[in-house]
């Protein structure tokens, strides 16, 4: 799935008759709750609720960075923390190009295509204060704010070319619908890497 933050939406786009919402789970795994506000040319405008994430910034090609980021975060939730506690697996794994961040924060990087931020959603039972402390300082916790995103779902093997094609499709849908885009793209990976591409 690919998505982008929304700056503004042209008036005249109707809301769905019965606004759809996600209960905050996917295939038995906890996921960030959202509400579908509109359908736009095969995409959905979603309002995501605030949630807590653990994230790392990694350098490399898209697929390599995803594997490295996933591995580091999986190590954390499977006990790579000061209390050796396990944290429940959630979905999705999120990947996005890193953006320039003010010098006062720990990570400053331009989104030149080889610097990526990979994140896991943390279970709702935790706060920043109650999560186990990571064994590494490369993992940071981020509390998201409500975010309106335009989202395009797709299946299959999500290689770099396919992700770029889906993002271009999403941008075209948004432009045609008068949706002004903000940050992105965000890539959401919901299924295990061993899931067959036609599932």
Where are these regions (language model features)?
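A solvent-exposed interaction/effector surface
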Residues: 2-199
